């Protein structure tokens, strides 16, 4: 029963992540003026990271009593990724973006690297969730 709940929780998280990355964020930047879109996304990301961390942590806690250590490790890694993104990566991305918008070319390059790292982390988390779902589906 706990593994099933963890499966559903993880599947919902993966679906939300894919929707956010492939649907919501691109839509914001194609439908809103650039400055408005940037401010809006900056306000949304802390919520996205908190919800992601909380959901992955819930999956981790649901799995703990099962002793399925590989699944527990994957769920915990996803939660950790969200916390890393929220408390380390996001402030650095925002600071680099702000300096870049003020004309600092080096900051623009730093922003591009940090943003790329953020996208890569999100992709790695999605792959970890796919792996977790496969493990849980196997029973």
Label for each model-derived stretch:
Residues 1-139:
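Polytopic transmembrane helical bundles with strong interfacial aromatic enrichment
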């Amino acid at each position: 029963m706990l593994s099933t709940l963890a499966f559903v929780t993880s599947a919902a998280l993966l679906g939300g992540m894919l929707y956010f990355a492939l649907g919501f964020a691109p839509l914001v930047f194609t439908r809103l003026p650039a400055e408005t879109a940037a401010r809006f996304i900056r306000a949304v990301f802390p919520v996205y990271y908190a919800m992601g961390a909380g959901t992955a942590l819930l999956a981790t806690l649901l799995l703990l009593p099962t002793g399925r250590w590989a699944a527990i490790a994957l769920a915990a890694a996803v939660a950790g990724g969200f916390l890393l993104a929220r408390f380390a990566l996001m402030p650095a991305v925002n600071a680099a973006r702000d300096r870049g918008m003020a004309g600092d070319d080096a900051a623009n390059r730093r922003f591009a690297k940090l943003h790329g790292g953020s996208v890569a982390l999100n992709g790695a988390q999605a792959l970890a969730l796919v792996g977790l779902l496969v493990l849980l589906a196997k029973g």
